[in-house]
Amino acid sequence: MKPFSPSQTNFEKEQLCFGVYQLKDCYQQVIEALSLGIRVIDSAITYRNEKECEQAIQDFCHQNVNIKREDITLITKIPDSLQGFERTWKAVEQSLRRTGRPKLDVVLIHSPKWPVRRIESWRALLQHQKEGRINKIGVSNYNIHHLEEIISLGLPLPAINQVEFSAFNNRPTFLSYCFNHGILVQAFSPLTRGYRLSDIRLLDLSLKYNKTPANILLRYCLQKGVSPIFKASSFVHIHENVKAEQFMLDPSDMDVMDTWDEEFVSKPTWNPIILP
């Protein structure tokens, strides 16, 4: 069964998110994702497409007057190279200029790489938020001990934590911790970068529900209270992935999928959640 998850606002609930890392035609893909009901776009400073994403969102809202800009969330992230109070402070200002927005929707710290700098960066984001330049702030690739560090300093916890999560790496203890502290969990690589899409157990469920393996994995995340971030390079794939919101997995199948956990990491050379 799906555990408790925070849902105070439309953004703070589990939903499909569209990732724009290395998209060749970012602007058009974002337009197409929005047209299919996606309302969270996941970008980052290192992706170099914040401006394209914001322009696509603005144009979509202009063409669809019933959709307001505040109905859509654009996430960006502070890279390791810009950690530290001053660098993070300036990075936020630069993102504001790139997007032309008076206030950023969501800003995350991309990883906990630098022990001292990550706290300085967190303080910078808190101050920007206090002064009205950011709506919500969060982190990415933070494990429980990284979050405990924030608590030990008497600082507010992040609203969002974006980590690798899938049926093959379902982090039960971590998930419970985040939910108990009111932290929304977003999943990158929920489709395991394709490495587990041919798993026979997954294919069996795909056949049972008449859905793609990707649909099954995305649906699993949603029913765990996690917001999966998927990437697709064509309208057809975006349309196919959105179908994950149109069905439910039986509780018994969810329980079975819970047993698939093997702590699978799709990119072992970059796994910052294990950093001290």
UniProtKB/Swiss-Prot annotation:
Similarity remark: Belongs to the aldo/keto reductase family.
Family matches, as InterPro entries: AKR (IPR020471), NADP_OxRdtase_dom (IPR023210), NADP_OxRdtase_dom_sf (IPR036812)
Entry's localization field: Cytoplasm; Nucleus
Domain of life where this protein originates: Eukaryota
Record-listed substrate binding positions: H110
Organism for this UniProt entry: Schizosaccharomyces pombe (strain 972 / ATCC 24843)
Enzyme class name: oxidoreductase
An example Gene Ontology biological process: arabinose catabolic process
List of catalytic residues: Y47 (proton donor)
Gene3D superfamilies tied to this protein: NADP-dependent oxidoreductase domain
Gene Ontology cellular component terms for the protein in this record: cytosol; nucleus
Keyword Cytoplasm: yes
EC numbers on record: 1.-.-.-
Name of the featured protein: Uncharacterized oxidoreductase C28F2.05
Keyword Cytoplasm recorded: yes
Site (Lowers pKa of active site Tyr): K77
Lineage of the species this protein comes from: Eukaryota, Fungi, Dikarya, Ascomycota, Taphrinomycotina
Keywords annotated in UniProt: Cytoplasm, Nucleus, Oxidoreductase
GO MF term list: aldose reductase (NADPH) activity; L-arabinose reductase (NADPH) activity
Pfam hit, one: Aldo_ket_red
